[in-house]
Amino acid sequence: MQYYQMMKALRMLKKPKPGCLGIEIQSVPIPQPKNGELLVKIEAAAINPSDLMNATGGFPYTVYPRIVGRDYAGTVISGASHLVGTRVFGTSGSELSFTKDGTHAEYCIIPEKAAVRMPSNLSFTEAASVGVPFTTAYLALSRGETKGSDIVLVVGALGAVGSAVCQIAEDWGCKVITVSRSGSTDINTVVDPELKRVHELVEKVDVVIDTVGDPLLMKSALNQLGIGGRLSYISAPKQGSIEFSYDMKQIYRKNLKIIGCNSLLLSLVESNSLLKNMVAKFEAGKYKVLNKKIAETSLTDECINSYRKLMNECSTKFVITMSTN
């Protein structure tokens, strides 16, 4: 493949003004892999909340111009000969989409060490939806020192990350209590914002995984922890105050821990080593993708409109697809 061949990509030329979407479809040269790198033909690439934040100038470490996108599924077409033709999927910490060109393009370069075989029972669209949600979920649980005997309270259990947290925790043997704004979970925060029903279900909670980042709800969740409990959170409010107040006596008397989790601190190789360990779980049906919330979009102005919908708090999981898969 020659360098002068071109591809379509969703790209930022410069840092957007605050709150403005700074992406556009451009034609750029297809990148060429160096030693130790692979060229992947992207078949599908999910749009994550962090992609939206990046596309609106929300990160200080993005280097411009830059192709956006962290998650992907596709086929290796150039690089190590034993991997050419392999279907792969993956994700990234603060490299793809930030300091290296990302996955919202027809082709992308990844390190050979970061290549992960795609689960055989997933479509490209499904596989592209796994990366950020499942690695973030694993990180939140592991940083929360979660054990198989723990009772885990999952705030935002119906979201992409929350659903992944529930599946992983249950696979580890934990008892899971689900929390959301919906009546389909154990606790509905619309009618029980203080999470009082927790005590009807269990005596205490060992771990809280908060995927929402609402200060008042986070405080309510913290109050449910027993001695030695851990609260692990992955998000903060996008608007309004980002301050969180807590009872200092409660923290030290109950020996509690409050832990922040940021998947962007993982390297490409570290992120994908987590995914590699999950492949068998997907193939065994223990981990599943939330298909009902996925909507496919194309690498045209349509995907830019999908970004705009996400700016308006749309809960759909958009996946950019390059062809039928």
Curated annotation (Swiss-Prot):
List the Pfam families hit by this protein, alphabetically. Answer: ADH_N, ADH_zinc_N
**Keywords carried by this UniProt record:** Cytoplasm, Nucleus, Oxidoreductase
Name the InterPro entries on file.
ADH-like_C, ADH-like_N, GroES-like_sf, Lipid_raft_assoc_Zn_ADH, NAD(P)-bd_dom_sf, PKS_ER
Q: Which SUPFAM superfamilies match?
A: GroES-like, NAD(P)-binding Rossmann-fold domains
Molecular function via GO: oxidoreductase activity, acting on the CH-OH group of donors, NAD or NADP as acceptor
- Which compartment or compartments is the protein found in? Cytoplasm; Nucleus
The cellular component terms of Gene Ontology attached to this UniProt record, alphabetical and capped at eight, are:
cytoplasm; nucleus
Q: What is its EC number?
A: 1.-.-.-
Name the domain of life: Eukaryota
What top-level class of enzyme does the UniProt entry assign?
oxidoreductase
Q: Which family does it belong to?
A: Belongs to the zinc-containing alcohol dehydrogenase family. Quinone oxidoreductase subfamily.
Protein name listed in UniProt: Zinc-type alcohol dehydrogenase-like protein C337.11
What's the source species for this entry?
A: Schizosaccharomyces pombe (strain 972 / ATCC 24843)
Upper lineage is:
Eukaryota, Fungi, Dikarya, Ascomycota, Taphrinomycotina
